[in-house]
Amino acid sequence: MNLKNIFTTALGCFAVLAACGNDNDSDVTPTPDQPTEEAKDVTIYVTNTSRTYDLTKSGLAFGTGSNMSPSTVTLDPATRYQEMDGFGAAITGSTSYNLMQMTQENRTKFLTETFSDKEGYGFSYVRIAIGCSDFSFSEFTCCDEKGLEHFALPMEDTKYVIPILKEILAINPTVKVIAAPWTCPKWMKVKSLEERVPFDSWTSGHLNPEYYRTYGEYFVKWIQAFEKEGIKIHAVTPQNEPLNHGNSASLFMGWEEARDFIKTGLGPAFKEAGVATKIYVFDHNYNYDNLADQKSYPTKIYDDAEASQYIAGAAYHNYGGNRSELLNIHK
């Protein structure tokens, strides 16, 4: 089995923490030197509880000697793991709506502080929903009426999410976008895979295997629609939180379902359309929601050669379990 890159993602924001302490940490927190011509090896951002430092940018030079600092980081250049693609935040419908309520001047200032690699924190990744999420105005997909001929980007995307993404990319064109659906269109759902009774609900259900290829083409249409707006989609996952039955918009997709969808629907649809967007599997918690038959979800899919050829890695959330699971998956 080929090792896969592991991509960790969290719904909401990624937190960047540089320093913390007790209530008197303004007296004890080490103060980094201000950037100098010699201190260019590392850029650090410092925040303390007294807010005397609030993501304050500073520079640091590598050294070979020992020191008494309690926050020393020791690097071994001979040992290398995966490359870090970046850090970022979720751009949901509600996030985009709230940003659009700001004045253009204030919004540009905020987005520059967040995404600019020259004048801000340099966030380099954003996560968005394919269709609705649990931070949307309501539940919807891009094709609520049966048949892909009815596919269209929803108002939440065209009026809020896409304009915000364009402003972000104007500030930092290198920002990467990863996306996931919270649910497939309801007309693609069944209550169970055994009986395949139609399931007219935004919450839970399964993707009807009869629609695996159709749903793969749905992804292609969505990616192409965003590309027409000048927004390249770096990666997708087949399903946000696939083991979560209870979200406002959700779809249960066990590892066997994900495997079969990828190798017979999503992967072939991408290949036929020439879509270069990466596919990450899983996109849920380290503990697999304590479902014994779903443990090691990604590696079970990797073991299938037909599915694995389309997969770039795995995505994880930090809501449950221990991040040491990433080491197990990497092995």
Regions found by a protein language model. Give the residues of each.
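A cross-family glycoside hydrolase active-site/sugar-binding cleft signature
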Residues: 90, 127-129, 178-180, 237-239, ...
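Flexible, active-site-proximal loop/turn residues at the rims of small-molecule/cofactor binding pockets
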Residues: 30-31, 132, 242, 320
